[in-house]
Every structure is written in structure tokens, then in C-alpha cells.
Amino acid sequence: MTVDAAGAGAESDVAETEGEIALFAALASLFPGMPIRRDADFFTDLGGHSFFAARLASALRVNPRFAQITVRDIYQQRRIGAIAEVLDQAPQEMAAPVDWTPPSAWRRWRCGVAQALALPVMVSLRMTQWLAPFFTYHLLTGSPDDSVALATLASISVFLIATVLQFFIAWAAKWLIVGRLKPGIYPLWGVTYFRWWAADRMVESAPTYLLSGSSLYPLWLRALGAKIGEEVIIGGATVRAHDLLEIGDGVSVGNGVSFENARVERGQLHLGRIALQDNACVGSYVIMEGNTAIGPWGHLEAQSAMADGREVPAGRIWQGSPARDVGAFDTLGQPARPVTSPARLRAEKLFFVFGVLLVATLFFIPVFPTFFLIDWFDTQNVLPWFEGSGPLGQLACYFLLAFPASAVLIVATVLASAALRWIVFPRLKPGRYAVHSNTYCAKWLISQIQEASLNVLSGIYATVYSPFWYRLLGAKVGRDAEISSAQGVIPDMLTLGDETFIADAVMLGDERIDGGWMTMQPTVVSHRSFVGNGGYIADGTVLPENVLIGVHSCAPHNSKVADGDTWLGSPPIHLPAREQVSGAPESLTFKPSPLRRLARGLVEGVRIVTPHAVVIAVGYTVMLDLMPLADQERWGAVLAYLAVIGMAYSVGNFLLIAALKWLVMGRYRKRADPMWTPFVWLSEGITSLYEGMAAPNFMRYLRGTPWLPLAFNLLGCKIGRGVYMDTTDITEFDCVSIGADSELNAGACPQTHLFEDRVMKIDHVSIGERVYMGPRSAVLYSAVVGNDAHLGPLTLVMKGEHIPACSRWAGCPAAPDKA
């Protein structure tokens, strides 16, 4: 059978095979009136780009025969005839969908009620950490003769004790609630699930980021039940089932690693073992599901994903999403592990203990100038019209007083952190260093300052103020650079050119640790280059000008990148062309007027200060009611009051953000706005307040409960019944639609906006019913995921892409999963 491509004209080739017929028809609708030839290049001849490639793949998938065509196929083949050959070689039969029965509403809500009863305890314990030093300071400064210096020292001591107690409480809760977990498959919303969930929430509450990269971290994991060998270095990891993690001697684990050995799929909790054998190496931003292993000297490279049941053989290197063998590891080329004396190891442990307490104190001390300033405002009766008002009036009064005081707190914290960094440590230099060296210890403390700032000063990121913060820490940051919440940054090694853009959660130039050695190399992102959300930029990377690294993508080797390139995926593939937004004037993207700079600075200043002002205002208001109970030594009443206030504060944060979202933004709809416009500032402000207030104080406790979808629906999402959500990573809420009984695991993200070309583009994400999203999988805007689809870990669904119903996909970008 031969047919002419519809509407393509006489210059088109005649489609002959089944693949050509489908391809020519799809191309004719994408490029009406253009000749369709077998030797034509989709990008250079037809003018295709990344968005059109996704649309073409989606159009072809309408035919079940071609449901497994991928965007990567189009990028790699390019020529129309070659793409048609891929279609003709497609398998004739698709895998049959797996039938499963979602848990009943009775089981779900029975567990939900039990979870709701546990929430006040969890929230109150978090509240105690910052209310206890508040209480101590005001208890000891109630009389004119009291010593402010003594009250300050006592408050710091109580804060540090509360910080240490958080670890102890998390440890005790884990063993009391769940004991030792065993691998297996358990019903979702059952007893084992509830116990795992409660223990996971309690362990998550401990500030483990303070231990990252230190020799204290393995001790903490052992205390929680993991089997950890000697000479193990762990940069930073999330572990979902500690009892099922086994790490051998000499293992190195990078930053931002996710050991997702507990996940929910098809109405069941899957608990599996993860084993890293002696001298294995796990790169940064790796995801490992349960029932996975890495053999001796095996290497799993950064930004890779290992799905359930996979294993890296001894001495092999695996890379990518999904991870595949890329060669042998040269053990002979690995330098010998440096010998370290027991005395040095003991001294390092003491240094890390001191460093943890120092960093914790550093980010707490600036609260005292805030106390002094508010107390002075109070004695001067600055706001007399609030005198004699009730609790709400007191709260409003202290919020207004706390606003300028919180600005002082933030500035003092930034300056104190920078001062410590420069007074104590010189500028780090590139090179290879032993992990048991003074250079490593210096790098660790500098990294801890930056990492702690992500938790304490999170509002600064993605604002006009973030470049100044990085410069204070030692990074070289060009004019008009935009930097969001980058991770793993070694400031002395980082250079960002003018007008660069670093999106959320980018792992940016972190050190590489392997075999007892740490390597640091300069990382450069040049003029107007862009790194997308969740991207990985290895240390030593030099990105030329105008380069774009896509969402969840790795930067390729320096020798492969040229000016203006676009790279996507893990491993990365080169995109010959991408969709670009034109028409926005540079005055709204790269060259704003002084007035716009001032306006944005004011809006972002308010968003930075507000979370701290709310905390301080609530703290002062609570103290007014709490002090009389303490004076009467009614300690039982004090604890009960704290429990009630803790839950009220948590829910209040959520209700405040929900009200602000509807009042300020209304309902999100599809749109595109240049970065230097009020809509973008306000939208990003709501997102920042959500991530800084509602998410940590309320939403994160609802992860894994039937209450989280209801909370998101109040914010504007459309989430069906029975949806399981272990993620809070949603921003433009009204643009998210999730069908009934779908399962979104940890870090899964329906991403409703992108900032390419400094234009904020927002559109809908539609996820069907009974869809499974694995850990850190992402669906970009304008994409549709069909019913019963399965997305593996670290899978990226491109914007405009359509994932067929009842199909399995894995990879970055998504490709058919043969599992």
C-alpha cells in the first residue's frame, strides 16, 4: 500500500510502509504544507524542535503499534526515513496491563484517622525545639534585675540541648514504633504501613543535614539499624528503611542520594534491601530502590537510577536513568587509600561534634538581636492601639514588631556566617585531598554553612539577594545571575557568568569522593547559560555561553559542549533545536529598569522576612499565655498548651498560605510571563512561602496520609479519591490534575512551570487514574499521562508528551520500560 502524505503536496515522498504512513500523516499535521521526504532532517529541514518532537511522539503513540516510540528516537535518528524504520521495527504486541484492586476506602480512612491522632505529637515535638529557648529567654528576663547575658547563654544552651534531643527522640521513636523492619510486600494503609510511616516521619524530623559528610553520619545510621562498615563516607542520603541498608567497608556515597527502599506500588508497600559491598562508590543524586546492590569496587555514577531488582556487578561502572553498564572500573589506577591513625579519627569526631554545634548555634544566635529589638519596641509602646487587645490583636502587634526585627535577624545571620567562613578558613584550592585531612574538614564546615542556610535562610534563594549570599561565601557570581536552591556548592570552586540561571535543586559542582580521596575542581557556568530543575553539574564542568541543561539532566563532558547547545537527559543527549519563547523585550527578561529592580527587591524582601516574623510573633504571643502557667509551676498544663498550640500553629501556617494563594494569585491558568513582571514575583513569593511555611510545618507531616490530597485540593489541585502522595512538590496548584488511586512516591513532581529564556511558562499537567510515579519522577507541563501508566524512578516526561495508558516507562527522557 502506498499513500501520499496528507496535505504535503506533490514534492513529498509517497509513504509505503505502515510506519511511514503513520509518520507522514503526523508530520503533515505538525508542518502543514511542507514536503515530507525520507531524507529530510526533522530539525534542520522541517524546523522541528523539542516541543514538536514530544508532540510527534505523542501523535504516533495513538496507534498502539507505535506506543513505544520515544522522544530520544527522534533526537537520535533525526532523518524522517530513519524514524520510520524505527516505527516499522516496533513490536507487534504490547505488554498486557497488570490488574490490581485499589485499597478500600474503609482501610484508607481507618489508617488516616490513626495518622491524624499521631500528628499533634509529631508537630508539638517540632514546636518544642524553638519554643523551649524562647521560653527560657523570657523566663529569665521577666524582672528588671535579670541578666540578659545569662538569659542569652541559657537560651543557647537549651536550643543545643533541644537539637540533640531531636536526634534522641527520633532514635527512640524508630525503635519503639517499628522495631526492626523485614523486607517484603505489605498492604497499603495496613498496620505495618502505619508503623513504617510514623517512624519515617519521626526520623525525618531530626536535623540530619548537620551530620552530612562527617564521620558522625555512619554512627547515626547504625543507631537506626543500618549495617555500616568502616571507613565509610556519606555526603548526604535519604534512607526510607534503615534496617534494610547494608554498606560495606570503604564505601563512598555522594550528596543528595536517595535510598528509596520503601515505596508504594499498586496498593502495596514494598520494603527491600540495598547492599553496597566493599569499596563501592555511589555518585551524587543517585536513586536506588529496594532489592538492589552494588558489588565490590562497583560504581554507580551521579544522576543515575537503579530500579528494584537491579545489581551492579563487581568492578563495573553503571550510569544513567535507568542505569546501564558503561565499562570497567580501573582498580589499578585508583590511588591507595591513605592510612589514618586512630588518634586522628578520634580527633575528627570531636571536630565534627564541635562543628555541628557551632553551625547550629551560628544560625540561632542572630535571634537575640531580634529579641532585644522587639523588647525595646514593646517598652517604647510603639504600637499603642494594640494595648488590651485579645490574642489575635497581640499576634498582629508582634507580627508588625517582628517584621523589621526579622530583617535584622536575616542580615545578622548572613554576615555572621560569612565572617566565620573567612576568619576560620582560607580559600580552598583545586586538587585531590585525603578525606581525613584538614582540607576536607575545612570544606566540610564551609559546606555545612551553605547547607544549613538552605534550611534556615531558604527564602533568600531564587531572589535578587541570592547572588550576594554566594559572593559572601566566596563564589564568583556575575551580574544579574539568578540562583535558586543549588546544592553541593563549594563556593571557592564556583564561577557563574553574567545572566546565568540556576533553577531549583541543582547539584552544582559538588566534590567527588572515592577510595578515601576527595577531588575538587573549578566549575564554570558561562554567560546566559541555564541549568534546569534537578540538574547535575559535576565539578570540573565548564559550560560555554548560552547552553541549556534540561530538567533532571547531566552536563556532558566539556569536550562535547559548544556555545548555544541544548542537552537533555541522563546520560545527556544533544537536542539540535528547542522551543524558544520570543517577543518578550529584554527590559523584562535580562535588562530590567532600576524601578523594576527596586519593586522586585521589595516584594522578595517581604517574602524572605515573613516566615521568620510569623515564627517570632507566634512565639511572643504564646509566651504571654504560657508564662503565668509556668509561674504557677503547672507543668502539665504547659505541656498540654504546647501540644494544642503546636497543632494550631501547624494548621494556621497552611490556612495562611491557602488564603494568600487565593487572595494574591487567584486561580492559575496557562500563561507565559517575563521574569521581571509582578505576576512572576508574586507567584514565586507564594511558592516560597508555601515551601518555607506550609510545607515544613504542616504538609510534610501529611505525606503518606489520605489527608494530603485534600489539603492540595484546598489549594486548587484536582486530585481524585484514593490517591497516595509521598511528595509535597507542587507549585501552580490549579494546573495539576491527578486521577483516582494514583501513587506519587517520594520526590515525584508534576512540574507546571519552566523558566527557559527567562519567561515563566505555566501550563497544566494531567495524570490519569491508577498511575504510578516512582521516586523523583517528573512530568513537565502540557504533558498527559494515561490511565494505569507506570513511570520508574528518575523518569522525565517531556512537555507536550503523551504517555499511553497501560504502558511502562523509565528513563530521562522517558522510554519504554522492558521490566
Model-flagged regions — what are they?
Residues 81, 94-225, 314-474, 559-716, ...:
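Terminal amphipathic alpha-helical/low-complexity segments used for targeting or macromolecular assembly
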Residues 15-16, 209, 273, 458, ...:
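Residue-level marker of regulatory loop/turn positions in helix-turn-helix DNA-binding domains and
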Residues 221-222, 227-325, 470-471, 476-574, ...:
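Structural signal for interior beta-strand "rungs" in well-ordered beta-sheet cores
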Residues 34-36, 68, 91, 144, ...:
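Secondary-structure boundary/capping signal
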Residues 12-16, 72-76, 106, 210, ...:
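Alpha-helix initiation/capping motif
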Residues 35-36, 67, 213, 281, ...:
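N-terminal alpha-helical segment
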Residues 1-99:
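Phosphopantetheine-dependent thiolation modules in NRPS/PKS and related acyl-activating systems
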